[in-house]
Amino acid sequence: MEGVFNNKKFILVFVFMLGLCIGITTVHGQGTRVGFYSRTCPRAESIVRSTVRSHVNSDPTLAAKILRMHFHDCFVQGCDGSILISGPATEKTAFANLGLRGYEIIDDAKTQLEAACPGVVSCADILALAARDSVVLSGGLSWQVPTGRRDGRVSQASDVSNLPAPSDSVDVQKQKFAAKGLNTQDLVTLVGGHTIGTSECQFFSNRLFNFNGTAAADPAIDPSFVSNLQALCPQNTGAANRVALDTGSQFKFDTSYFSNLRNRRGVLQSDQALWNDPSTKSFVQRYLGLRGFLGLTFNVEFGKSMVKMSNIGVKTGTDGEIRKICSAFN
């Protein structure tokens, strides 16, 4: 019996030490955790949620804009709120970020949080939480957002060059995502966020009138859809017009975006390429449950990929700062 007891004791100690090691790895590897503000600012998440709800209820297009802002923040300098800084030559001024909107939501939430818990909640965390809440308000499933990020002290327009572009091939997209620790499934899943997105015509008009110098439209687009897009984006005059990336379901977070790719109705060249390339097409098919593929639940997988993305290059501990105002360094 003593031998059995000693064995059990050894196993318990081993399991405890293993758990301790895993916990240490998690803290040092990411530095964020669910419920980070549970003691220091218990109402942090509810304040952000109610703020986002108020703004999105007034303007449903803001949901996609906040989601896009979080993506752009994470892909440059990590998820540190650097996209929020105002001033000359900051990330906000880069061409790829000129169309970003919704900064007032983050500022509004920050003002309320500073009144409730001064100097506690970072702008980077507010943006991460707001992105989740925007998806939920659009009909998507919720997920737990690890918090504890600190705000970065650098914001340079010159660092924005690594953002995915609307004409990127699948190979280029995969390279850019892999550089951030994201795999091919994450790529397809996160781009699926375009289900509530829009784009200015200037980012895809090359597909409509003179694709690759052919004086014709991109043959990858369904001909009837070409006519629709040409009407929405008149040649030489409609560059700033906005078009939904998920036709017929612009404000609903669902899988119809993937159905549009299957039907050759992807607006951006980079989006339609996900259906045309075998390495990404298989994931699109799985989200649609096609041809016997093991199905994936888009809403569930989106939350998982968002957690991965939101931990890119986070600043924790004594790194960075907790800004008093999200648009300016302390």
UniProtKB/Swiss-Prot annotation:
InterPro entries (UniProt xref): Haem_peroxidase, Haem_peroxidase_sf, Peroxidase_pln, Peroxidases_AS, Peroxidases_heam-ligand_BS, Secretory_peroxidase
Residues with site note (Transition state stabilizer): R68
Cellular component, GO annotation: extracellular region
Keyword flag Translocase: no
Active site: H72
Region of interest called Disordered, as start-end residue ranges on this chain: 149-168
Reactions catalysed, as given in the entry: 2 a phenolic donor + H2O2 = 2 a phenolic radical donor + 2 H2O
GO terms, biological process: hydrogen peroxide catabolic process; response to oxidative stress
EC number: 1.11.1.7
One term of GO molecular function: lactoperoxidase activity
Keyword Secreted in record: yes
Disulfide bridge map: C41-C117, C74-C79, C123-C326, C201-C233
Protein name: Cationic peroxidase 2
Taxonomic source organism: Arachis hypogaea
Encoding gene per record: PNC2
